[in-house]
UniProtKB/Swiss-Prot annotation:
Single GO MF descriptor: ATP binding
Homology family: Belongs to the class-I aminoacyl-tRNA synthetase family.
Pfam families on file: tRNA-synt_1f
Name listed for the protein in its UniProt record: Lysine--tRNA ligase
Organism the protein comes from: Brucella suis biovar 1 (strain 1330)
Amino acid sequence: MTSHRLPEITLTPELTAAAAEAKAWPFEEARKILKRYAKTGLPETVIFETGYGPSGLPHIGTFGEVARTSMVRHAFRILTQDKVKTRLICFSDDLDGMRKVPDNVPDRAALEPYLQMPLSSVPNPFGGDYKSFAKHNNAMLCRFLDTFGFDYEFASATEYYRSGRFDTVLLKAVERYDDIMKVMLPTLGEERQATYSPFLPISPKSGRVLYVPMKKVDAKAGTITFDDEDGEETTLSVTGGKVKLQWKPDFGMRWAALGVDFEMFGKDHQTNAGIYDRICEILGGRAPEHFVYELFLDQLGQKISKSKGNGISIDEWLAYAPTESLALYNFQKPKTAKKLYFDVIPKTVDEYFTYLSAYARQEWKDRLNNPVWHIHYGNPPKADLPVTFALMLNLVSASNAESPAVLWGFISRHVPGVTPENNPELDALVGYAIRYFNDFVKPTKKFRAPDDVERAALEALDAKLGELPAGTDGNVIQNAILDVARAIERYQDHTKKSPEGGPGVSVSFFQMLYEVLIGQERGPRFGSFVALYGIDETRALIKKALAGELA
């Protein structure tokens, strides 16, 4: 088990009062637990649980469960004024059989002989000190949870089954075998009904997890009898890790054995939630409170799968953005299916810093609805980001900067007094921006030559910028750009009005600027970009475009 220190809580009357009214989803979920114990009073310890299937490396969805559950746990601590102990158990189903060889492992053929073996008995294909596939993947999960400083207890199904921690409930499952079958059989097709058993023996001969019908279930002896793979009739005790449960009964058994009060799971489990609950109750437990979240999708709109390795990995996100941005993406709209791919990173980074800058100015009731309060467990840091991530990406694109020093040259001129030393958050973003640009923006950059109308517009813009002194504010530059566009019929938008009452400016004008000057379809406010990049530098860029040196 791995355990870390819980974040400290400073309770104030303002915080307590705001929490009682807070509408953010972690508070709504925490109130379910209060309601659960409204009649009996709260227990000494409330148990939160998340599950992990180590058939593949942990992905962001796996991390998201722990992050979101931790947010609910923190909200619960505030609502109870931290008078009730809490535990978060991260449970790995590492006794499950390997149903197929994952796509994203080295030397797949070497794992073929281990199909249907418990994941904790499959050799580790990645090298290093971990003895099994599951031990490696469990370590990868813990490593990442540790980098975030989560307070959690890691639990292994293999250890819990083999150490006897589930024995009492497993013996109860033998006693109540018929009741469990009454829940399970109606959920199965006719063919499966004939052979289904909630018990999966682990063959004493081959070590494989067996999906075989039961010949006898002996409640008194606590044993099951079945035919092993070679046809020999075999009797095993259900205790000591010789037998495990099918995954649906296993879910409910775990809740009963551990006394779980709250567990969230993906929408793919929603139809089975009633089954898990019923099994838990049959085995003498009380079903926990649930929270069902929508699944993350890859760039093609497909469900992200650990074994396929599609979508984006934890390490990949963290190569291009700070960890807090990942926590924000998990906090936002958990009941909405969202695409989880590289192109969501810049927007999420900028949203995080926008929320962070707003926090200090907010009343308590608004603070508790601000994602950064939940991400940082009520103690968000102070950070001032004078340049957005999106703007920095455009700066890298226009300047072809390969080193942080070049970018800092532009930033220091634009925001005097800001240095890498006194703004480490911004310095980190500079590194992220260069890496993100090189890996995702640069390969897709595509400049196009301007047509005659666009050439005239660019010439007019060049002349207009020439009238502005160096160091002109971004808003003034933006207005000057709009003045140029308003005079050109193609870019007049008659559904909008200019300050003078004439037509407004179509977004197609700014799209043209980005396509011709930056080689991208869109970008942040162009006036802000010019202020950061420099008026003279932007004019030089326009001249290059007009001379055909970009496209």
